[in-house]
Amino acid sequence: MAYSWQTEPNRTEPQEDGSDTQQFHHTNQHLSSRQVRLGFDQLVEEINNKTPLSESEKEEDTYFVPDAPNLGSKWPSIYETHPRYFSEFTSQSPDSSQLRFGKLSAIGFNPAVLPTHQLIHEGASWRNPSGKYHGIEYPRFDALPPSSTGQGECNPQGQSGTKHHNYCGEHEGNLPHHHSSYSIDSIPNREKRRSGDVNLVEPSLEFSKDSFLPRTSENVSVESTEPIGCPIEIVEVPQGSNKNLASFCNKVKKIRESYHASDINSNSGKIWAITTAYPSRLFADTKFRVKISIDNSAQLLLLMPHANYLVKDLIAEILLLCANEPLSPKEYLLSVCGSEEFLQMDHSLGSHKIFQKNKSVIQLHLQKNRDTPGKLSRKSEDDHSPFHLNQLLEFTHIWKISRQCLSTVMKKYNLHVEHLLKPQKDMEEKHLSSMVSGNQHTSQPHVNNVLEEVKNICSVLGCIETKQVSDAVKELNLILQRPSQNFHQNSETSKKGFIERVTAELSRSIYQLIDVYCSSFCTDFQPVHTPGGVSHVHAGLQSHLSFTVCSLHNVPETWAHSYKAFSFSCWLTYAGKKLCQVKSCRPLPVTKSFSLLVNWNEIINFPLEIKSLPRESMLVIKLFGIDSATHSTNLLAWTCLPLFPRQESVLGSRLFSVTLQSEPPIEMIAPGVWDGSQPSPLTLQIDFPDAGWEYLKPESEENRTDHEEPPRECLKHIAKLSQKKSPLLLSEEKRRYLWFYRLYCNNENSSLPLVLGSAPGWDEETVSEMHAILRRWTFSHPWEALGLLTSRFPDQDIREVAVQQLDTLLTDELLDCLPQLVQAVKFEWNLESPLVELLPRRPLQSIRVAHCLYWLLRDAQGEAYFKSWYQELLAALQFCAGEALNEELSKEQKLVKLLGDIGEKVKSASDPQRKDVLKKEIGSLEEFFKDIKTCHLPLNPALCIKGIDRDACSYFTSNASPLKITFINANPMGKNISVIFKAGDDLRQDMLALQIIQVMDNAWLQEGLDMQMITYGCLSTGRAQGFIEMVPDAVTLAKIHLHSGLIGPLKENTIKKWFSQHNHLKEDYEKALRNFFYSCAGWCVVTFILGVCDRHNDNIMLTKSGHMFHIDFGKFLGHAQTFGGIKRDRAPFIFTSEMEYFITEGGKNIQHFQDFVELCCRAYNIVRKHSQLILSLLEMMLHAGLPELRGIEDLKYVHNNLRPQDTDLEATSHFTKKIKESLECFPVKLNNLIHTLAQMPALSLAKPAPQTLLQESCILNKTRTIQRVTILGFSKTHSNLYLMEVTCSDNRRSLTKKSFEQFYRLHSQMQKQFSSLALPEFPHWWHLPFTDSDHKRIRDLSHYVEQVLRGSYEVANSDCVLSFFLSEHIQPTLEDSPFVDPGENSLDKSPKVQLLMTYEDSRLTILVKHLKNIHLPDGSVPSAHVEIYLLPHPSEVRRKKTKCVPKCTDPTYNEIVVYDEVLGLQGHVLMLIVKSKTVFVGAVNIQLCSVPLNEEKWYPLGNSII
């Protein structure tokens, strides 16, 4: 990757000694885990354990440092404080300095190249994690040369530091400057004497050749620390102390400022009806029936506008009809009665979904004040409200720090420090101490108080105790324990000076702890300081990544008892792939101080050059514990962080919270997967090098656009590979091939996600080439960019281009992919990315988008990861939405909470008590509406509700016991609204399935095909809870089967009979038949593509108007339930013989089945054109945590069902096979039977008997008395059906047919219903042999019917009798059939064959579609197959044949016949012969030169072979 190192102006580059540094690097790199070099802190601990403080050697090491305590560093190391002396020292002792400081001598800094004193001192102690303070017992810090010359050499910086850092100058006089006379040259020799042959190297200074030089940290920079006596002040930071979140707040504020509340276009406050793009031919001749109500008028206006009529034109027409004076249409709006939804002025009526789905009379309301903002609009006060993220976030973290709490503790600390440093005389005068006798213990009580407050400060800050704090505490205690004789001549003064210095260092370490805490975590406070700059040092792009893992803070006591040691491992990852091998550290036990912690101080060096690291690289760290009993290593926690946030590297010391979740999701590792900036019980401290670098975009080569024309075979292969649609579905070899020919790819033969996803890596050259392709690519549609927001593309530039494309989508189009965009946030690099900016901005323009996004973000917070980012994004949305909308959303949230509590109580109650529990809990909902008056329905923001219909509420008897809740519509012109509230079921998968189905339906509508689909609303409102829209007048297929008797699922006329009972008029029946025809075809396609499983008659619903739809998508993508290894769902989709029976009207209109197959295949091929979009939508949900969508195999399943690589002919043939396979699958009926039997006991308790259906459904006018019924004849082909003519009292006649069994069931029904009345005797079912039984039965039945109709008036006019004779009427002709056979006259009875032929690349492809009106010579029904001969044909095999369709006069094949090596059509004849087994049925010869290619055509069949 390209990185730019920032250096100070006019800085000279030092010379490096390659041989020395190489030698040191070699030594450092080959250390094993047991040979990791010790730091000085461990050396001091060893010395302290062996040598008492009173030994003379310790006394010799006593020294003083001529450094004012107000300088912003702790007791600095030699080279930090006096660079020139260090330079001199290194020149005198090159060998020892090389061993001690490694990289430093190689770089060879001199004062001219060092940064300013502020940068030298700020945070220096943090970059010295293993160092000790200057004190009498620490031999590593030797005194500086005492000469005045030496001091003078550091005066420029020292004076500058004194000048700029002296906040409390009156105390400066109390700081004596002492100089030690100990020789600096003896340091290496003494270290060698004490440690043997081991080179002891300070971890924070130990760097290999290619590691970073330690510098100061940006986030812990303190340009000046507090001198003695100056308190540490904490100030409020409303925008947040974390610069990332503060920057996010500013970004969101700018977004809202760009949309003023006074802008009526973006802030209308109204909910606009959803529109979709559709071809005008879809409703070319359609007119809608519209009823218009007008303010201050009780009269309704009935109009029939054309579908292509614009809404504003309709308003103008209404005003023209009703107004007495000319009115401007611009001042009016049309709303949908019963809701708060408004039609969009510049759109046609037909483009509104409400008109597309609702074919009945639509009621609209005309109202004025178009320019008046709605009740949900933003107010001017909202424009001036500040955005403080901490006020909106609802974090539930354990360590939520209060500014007041920390300020209180800090005041106590400052007070005790002040008391400690007061002169003895002042202490006596103010009576602040009663323990003033004796030199040894005078200050001890105050020291104890100070240390207690230090402990409290650390406790408030998440029990974080840095090494600097610990060392300062130890130093303070040790100085007080030091005998007076060990100090200089003036013991009191000397000791006082040391106490002042140590307390100053303690304050400084606390200050730095607070500063680093505030910069690492999100707080609303920070310490008072002047921010300093950052030193960017050029260490070379060949440098290796290096950092120090310091310590783990606040280790739980249970861990300390259970685990004997702790270790960590770390690695780098990018786009879900590891970039390097895992690095591990040595295990160390827990140490005890103020709290339990583990001090590793482990330097990690990755053998990766800076320039080779992708910009979006992530560091993952896992923490392990070694079990004390089993000695096994257990994963305890983990965290992750970006290496280059905000285009720059991580600098200095940082604190990171860790999560206790089991395993890090490798494929989802991104900055938001675990927000380390949010405090948690465990905190990890990591010290990064203070050298920084900036990322620069690599320059791409644009001169490669001119290339030679690719070979034709190459283009064909590219197009073939591009049919995979997703790079996840391409093998490594195919991705290499596609990338090799990337310059030949364009939007006509490929897609951009596929091309960029085939890149071999993310090195600088490859990324440069990817960006070049990105710039010159032309998107075919914004939907194509969706694939660039998946987890495979972490590159920020690529994602930015994708968002730019998606931002061009219309508002209603954006709703179709909003759930995926919420998921795509997971893989953004920060909260200022273009996608995160788009999500709060688009809701400013649409209430519907804001409402949808709110509930998506609410639901997303229940996911295991990324919760913090979603909370912050939700806070931004609420800030932008304004007070009015937020109040409504708050009401909805309270409603959801109430329903969730009720659902849990009903579910947990016993079966007999559930009804009483529900009635009792409904009262809480009534109280809720008394308080808030009205509330919008979370399922649909356009619906406003004001109460509960108590009597209409109930619950379902399924496992989750979902509630049926009926709300009272707040709109007086609207009906009550019934919904299902589920508690205990995850509805996110249902939402996704319905979303994809809606996308398919939109694709059909855009192609002019209305499949009469019902896609009900579904909304997940949290963990395992949500709303489901109830479709009015819908009933499950199981209930229909149940009312047909025990074996209802096995009967073929069940569905037809039910529709006949509910649609007595001919036009109603035909409408229901048409709706079923289209909706059944649509659901066959969508359930096949999505692999919807667990299909049975309880998951299929029907409406009286004929619409069929599926519910419950808990099992999809082929994840079928199994019993004993056998799948329950063995059919590709649900299409049974009873559905075919209804479509073909009992087998009388077989051509309707052909039309059904044609419709299914057409719908299937339309959806296949949108395979890229469907697969992208699914791929973006792979990491949403859905139970059935988790991996590549699930995508492959949908891809295999879409078959984008097939031609339309091949896909047609494939889907036709699936239709036949489903039709012949008997286990489907068996499964329905099992479900029906399982529900019979439950339903029998609730409802008496099957006749209830007749009583409810067949409510006919009793004045329509049947005058007579005449049996005209019978047919043996369909179970001895008797054809009857029914004459009613109004002389209307109709035909119907019934079987003897149906007559018997009618008689049994009447016996049960009229048990007290005398009924005529029913004819016997048996007859003597050798008699004309059929004609005799006609006479018996005629006599029986006559007695029934002339008998009791109550019986003759009962619902069951009227329904029996007046339902299932027969249409005398097919002239008014709702099915249209394109290009054919249905009255033509001549035999025909339908073919479709294509010719390309010497290949002749023939699709044999259908045969029509074929019979055997004796008139019987054939079992036909088709034989095809190509004459002449060069190969020996000339004959090709289709499969046989048994016993059918209008068989459907949709089989493909292919002839290769056909060099031309001229001179070729296609001979087609139809046979039934070996019997000739018909034939035709076709001259291929005259055939219209790529068109369907019917060819007449002759009765002989020519």
Curated annotation (Swiss-Prot):
Organ and tissue specificity: Expressed predominantly in liver. Also found in kidney, lung and lymphoid tissue. Down-regulated in BeF3 cells expressing the BCR-ABL oncogene p185.
Alphabetical keyword list: ATP-binding, Chemotaxis, Kinase, Lipid metabolism, Membrane, Nucleotide-binding, Transferase
All residue ranges annotated as the PI3K-RBD domain in the record: 285-371
Region: Activation loop, residue numbers: 1110-1136
GO CC terms: membrane
EC number from the UniProt entry: 2.7.1.137, 2.7.1.154
Chain positions covered by the region annotation G-loop: 955-961
Matches recorded under PROSITE patterns: C2 (PS50004), C2_PI3K (PS51547), PI3_4_KINASE_1 (PS00915), PI3_4_KINASE_2 (PS00916), PI3_4_KINASE_3 (PS50290), PI3K_RBD (PS51546), PIK_HELICAL (PS51545), PX (PS50195)
InterPro entries linked: ARM-type_fold, C2_dom, C2_domain_sf, Kinase-like_dom_sf, PI3/4_kinase_cat_dom, PI3/4_kinase_cat_sf, PI3/4_kinase_CS, PI3K-C2-gamma_dom
Compositional bias annotation for Polar residues: 20-34
Protein location: Membrane
UniProt keyword annotation of RNA-binding present: no
GO molecular function terms listed in the Swiss-Prot or TrEMBL record: 1-phosphatidylinositol-3-kinase activity; 1-phosphatidylinositol-4-phosphate 3-kinase activity; ATP binding; phosphatidylinositol binding
Region feature Catalytic loop, mapped onto this chain: 1091-1099
Functional description taken from the UniProt entry: Generates phosphatidylinositol 3-phosphate (PtdIns3P) and phosphatidylinositol 3,4-bisphosphate (PtdIns(3,4)P2) that act as second messengers. May play a role in SDF1A-stimulated chemotaxis.
Similarity section: Belongs to the PI3/PI4-kinase family.
This protein's name: Phosphatidylinositol 3-kinase C2 domain-containing subunit gamma
Native species: Mus musculus (Mouse)
Origin organism lineage: Eukaryota, Metazoa, Chordata, Craniata, Vertebrata
